[in-house]
A protein has these predicted regions:
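Sec-dependent N-terminal signal peptides of Gram-positive bacterial secreted proteins and lipoproteins
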Residues: 4-23
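Function-determining sites in protein domains
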Residues: 20-145
Length: 145
């Protein structure tokens, strides 16, 4: 009986731990605020940006370019948003809608929506299932738009 109780407790603990929030880690670690460009954009394509597909700049409209002197404040506000990396369920295969685009000095790009992220390296898209608190994400977008 104790064995089953112990196994049940371990299972419960595992379920609780996998649903914990995790801090979002940027593509290149902590960005150098002086060498990045941050924009709020709309990923307009109906099909979204699929993993492995080529990056297409034509389907993106810029809503707002964050001024360089506001980069640090913007990233500080962004880091306050809770992020989750679900271990169960289906993974996203594309992202679309309003996003944060971070362009690094080497040309790599990070696209962040409230329900998923994508990185662009050498023109190829790689999606990740990282979700953010959608209300806090929307408030951030509204604050800087």
């Amino acid at each position: 009986m104790k064995k089953y109780l112990f196994i049940a407790m371990i299972c419960l603990l595992l379920v609780l731990l996998v649903s914990c929030t995790v801090p979002y880690s940027f593509m290149h670690g902590e960005p150098d605020i002086d060498t990045i460009k941050i924009e709020i954009v709309n990923l307009e394509t109906e099909m979204g940006y699929h993993a492995g597909s080529p990056y297409n700049e034509e389907n993106i409209s810029v809503i707002k370019v964050i001024e360089t002197d506001k980069n640090e404040e913007f990233l500080s506000d962004f880091k306050k948003i809770k992020s989750y990396q679900p271990n169960f369920g289906s993974r996203i295969d594309c992202i679309s809608g309003v996003a944060i685009r971070i362009t690094y000095a080497n040309g790599d790009i990070e696209l962040i929506t409230d329900y998923g992220t994508a990185t662009v390296k050498n023109g190829e898209i790689h999606n990740q299932t990282t979700t953010f608190d959608s209300d806090a994400f929307s408030e951030l977008i509204d604050k800087y738009s």
